Amino acid sequence: MTPSLTVLGIESSCDDTAAAVLRGPEVLSSVVYGQTALHAAFGGVVPELAARAHVEKLDIAVAAALSEAVLALDQIDVIAVTAGPGLIGGVLSGVMLAKGLSAASGVPLIGVNHLAGHALTPRFTDGLAFPYLMLLVSGGHCQFLRVEGPEAFHRLGGTIDDAPGEAFDKTAKLLGLPQPGGPAVEAEARAGDPARFVFPRPLLDRAGCDMSFSGLKTALLRARDGLVSAGGGLTAQDRADLCAGFQAAICDVLVEKSRRALTQSEGVTGFAVAGGVAANEQVRSGLARLAAELDAPFVAPPLRYCTDNAAMIAWAGQEAFSAGARSGLDLSARPRWPLDNSQPALLGSGKKGAKA
């Protein structure tokens, strides 16, 4: 790694417009413009609205990141941009801006896989050495990866249907809670009894590291409908207990599947978690306890680097650029982009969902 590289990162793959400047692992600036209020009335991210908002905010985010870092564009060594996977309108907006900046300034360009940004985050936040085990858990993805290099990822398993973040979002919608669903369900669960509703733990009876979360959502829907039929509606305690039971089931699945992934990951330097769902306190604490039990160093990046941000894109671009990777002005935006092409595609693999 060349520590003196100064990298401008650009991220626009879902509903956060972000730009950041890194010099080595040092974050000189990180700007994020969210779209939560824009999509609140629709119960989820509307791709067309998200794309238009990115167009309005991308240049503002880049200007703010450069200003905060007290740098001009000609002082940047590399421009790193998310080129996929994601909602194609937003990804395309970011790629087009990055290509324009590169063409106008002569600054080299590197396209970054958004998932690689999450997977490499423990490298710049905690200096975690290769190889390590990564649980990438977000709105659109859930997979175990053995991370062996900036562009070397081996998938051990993943979700065969919904990602946990998507399940959280849909659960929030079913219970009349605001979006994004993860923080809303987590907040409700704090006042709930996780033992009142015992939801299924899918695929724990099967070997391997694959996961499934769609059945959990269906089980919660049936429990909700049963309460409504019996009592004419949901009480505040009903809602809290449903959230607590649902969250406990998600955590149990993630912890047990992580146990299996760790036991088959010889020679790793540690176990890391990243992605938006990694911001969930119960998920983080459950994984931390597991790592301590198995005597594996555990890394959970600061919350601001678990959710979508451009600092992780700048870092992933810096790692790839230092390893010799380059992109030209023919860089394409990609709605799907699996990290491990040697493995059969998971259902929906490589495409971002509601939030990642």
From Swiss-Prot:
Compartmental location: Cytoplasm
InterPro entries: ATPase_NBD, Gcp-like_dom, KAE1/TsaD, TsaD
EC category: transferase
Reported cofactor(s): Fe(2+)
UniProt xrefs under SUPFAM superfamilies: Actin-like ATPase domain
Sequence positions that bind Fe cation: H114, H118, D308
Recorded GO MF terms: iron ion binding; N(6)-L-threonylcarbamoyladenine synthase activity
Keywords: Acyltransferase, Cytoplasm, Iron, Metal-binding, Transferase, tRNA processing
One GO CC term on file: cytoplasm
Spans annotated as Disordered: 333-356
Secretion signal span: none
EC assignment: 2.3.1.234
Catalytic reaction(s) noted: L-threonylcarbamoyladenylate + adenosine(37) in tRNA = N(6)-L-threonylcarbamoyladenosine(37) in tRNA + AMP + H(+)
Transmembrane segments: none
HAMAP family hit by this protein: TsaD
Cited function: Required for the formation of a threonylcarbamoyl group on adenosine at position 37 (t(6)A37) in tRNAs that read codons beginning with adenine. Is involved in the transfer of the threonylcarbamoyl moiety of threonylcarbamoyl-AMP (TC-AMP) to the N6 group of A37, together with TsaE and TsaB. TsaD likely plays a direct catalytic role in this reaction.
Name of this chain's protein: tRNA N6-adenosine threonylcarbamoyltransferase
Native organism: Dinoroseobacter shibae (strain DSM 16493 / NCIMB 14021 / DFL 12)
Taxonomic path: Bacteria, Pseudomonadati, Pseudomonadota, Alphaproteobacteria, Rhodobacterales
